[in-house]
């Protein structure tokens, strides 16, 4: 099954376009609960309650930092493996933001799709087409989300720079993503943040007729609103089933923003937040 079909299928099955980010805040974990046990507990409860989360996005960096390879310690990789094995049957997006010369990208592509068995991966476009093609050629059934207009405050430093024709760089990148989508496979998508709704609307409108998958961070702790994002996509005619709206710490560590310790009823609080988010992202 190609990636766009997988997105459509799982959006309909879950009646949602939600994506749960897995970005552990280690200082906010309950005392005595390991990172793998923490997330596996939440994932099992999601499955038991039938909560419709339509994709999952673990960030590999949070787990790589736990490894100490020179000491023979791969506890971070093992924790991530345990979490991946516990995921429900929705698309698994490996958030690794790779992108390098072709030979290096080929190895990063195998890392994502061969080693971790991801359905999709995030990559940077900065090094051009030969850094992207290894993720697409030979992996036509996979998804490749290319950073377009990111949700972080520093995204504007380069992405909003005006080109000679007056277009912002992020729009030139969008045009390039659309070209690569046609050239390589329909699984080429874009990462477009929800923290600037005017820019989001411009990009959603551009992508609406091209059926390019969107991964939308910036909702929850970063301030974006799932309801506003969905309203915009409906208004511009973007096919909702190809979108995934991501929220991470607001679902899995709601107390972290206030720098509070994990409460005793952490599981119930998280599941309530996850359930609410899934409904906010309903089709």
Where would I find each of the regions flagged by the language model?
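Conserved, mostly hydrophobic/aromatic
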Residues: 20, 56, 95, 121, ...
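Conserved N-terminal beta1-alpha1 strand-loop-helix module at the mouth
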Residues: 1-89, 265-283
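Acidic (Asp/Glu)-rich catalytic clusters
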Residues: 11-13, 43-51, 81-88, 135-140, ...
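Conserved anion-binding
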Residues: 25-26, 100-191
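C-terminal helical cap(s) of enzyme catalytic domains, especially alpha/beta-barrels
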Residues: 229-238, 242, 251-283
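A C-terminal functional module that forms or caps the active site or interfaces directly
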Residues: 195-246, 250-254
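Short, well-ordered coil/turn segments that N-cap beta-strands
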Residues: 14-18, 51-54, 88-91, 117-119, ...
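Active-site-adjacent beta->alpha loops and helix N-cap segments on the catalytic face
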Residues: 65-86, 101-105, 126-140, 195-206, ...
């Amino acid at each position: 099954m190609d990636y766009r079909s997988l997105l459509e299928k799982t959006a309909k099955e879950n009646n949602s376009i939600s994506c749960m980010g897995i970005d552990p805040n280690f200082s906010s974990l309950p005392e005595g609960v390991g990172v793998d046990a923490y997330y596996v507990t939440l994932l099992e409860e999601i499955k038991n309650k039938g909560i419709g989360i339509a994709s999952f996005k673990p960030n590999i960096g949070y787990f790589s930092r736990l490894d100490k390879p020179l000491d023979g310690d791969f506890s971070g990789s093992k924790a991530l493996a345990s979490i991946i094995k516990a995921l429900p049957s929705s698309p698994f997006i490996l958030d690794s933001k790779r992108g390098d010369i072709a030979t290096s990208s080929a190895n990063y592509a195998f890392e994502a799709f061969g080693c971790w068995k991801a359905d999709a991966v995030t990559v940077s476009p900065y090094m051009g087409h030969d850094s992207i093609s290894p993720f697409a050629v030979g992996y036509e059934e996979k998804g490749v989300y290319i950073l377009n207009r990111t949700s972080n405050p520093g995204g504007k430093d380069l992405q909003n720079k005006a080109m000679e024709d007056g277009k912002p760089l992020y729009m030139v990148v969008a045009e390039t993503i659309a070209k690569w989508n046609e050239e390589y496979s329909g699984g080429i998508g874009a990462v477009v943040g929800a923290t600037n709704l005017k820019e989001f609307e411009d990009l959603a409108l551009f992508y609406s007729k091209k059926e390019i998958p969107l991964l939308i961070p910036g909702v929850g702790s970063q301030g974006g609103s799932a309801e506003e994002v969905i309203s915009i996509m409906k208004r511009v005619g973007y096919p909702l089933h190809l979108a995934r709206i991501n929220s991470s710490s607001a679902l899995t560590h709601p107390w972290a923003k206030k720098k509070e310790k994990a409460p005793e009823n952490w599981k119930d609080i998280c599941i309530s937040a996850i359930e609410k988010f899934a409904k906010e992202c309903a089709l």
